């Protein structure tokens, strides 16, 4: 492994490691053991959905007052995509690029632990954005910090599915145009992949640091 690359999911992410990654502009890659954890959890979730007749909140059901509404297997990804789109409503001032990179770093690390049920490609695309300074535009207001930084994290994740705007090469660009430039397909969300990205407090975490 190059000294200019840090393997996400290879161990504890300390303040010292975070500082080095940001200050030395290190690139990120998934550690082999992280890939195994992510895939194992995704496989478990797929099996659970296929084999269980019980509703799984926010996965095979709607959210909140719609928790009694069952979602068909063909609409599980659409449910998650709609969750991201509907919550991407942060307002206020644009968050500084260095904080956006920190949020993506924390997000990638959390997902690399293999407890969220996301696809490998989802985590890899976060790393692609980080490594190429494709920085989602996120605003600093819109979070209670209770069940997660819902609106800011939805805005952070929105460009991965080809929606919203990013800062790239010093300019504000449509996310889909930057995806096309790199030859990246928008991530097609599967079950739980809208819940997983927004159910953290990565924006508020940088303030405590």
Where are these regions (language model features)?
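Structural motif
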Residues: 27, 54-57, 102, 135-136, ...
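Glycine-/small-residue-rich beta-strand-loop submotif within the FAD-binding core of flavoenzymes
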Residues: 12-13, 17-20, 24, 69-98, ...
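Anion-binding (especially nucleotide phosphate/pyrophosphate-binding) glycine-rich loop
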Residues: 46-50, 75-138
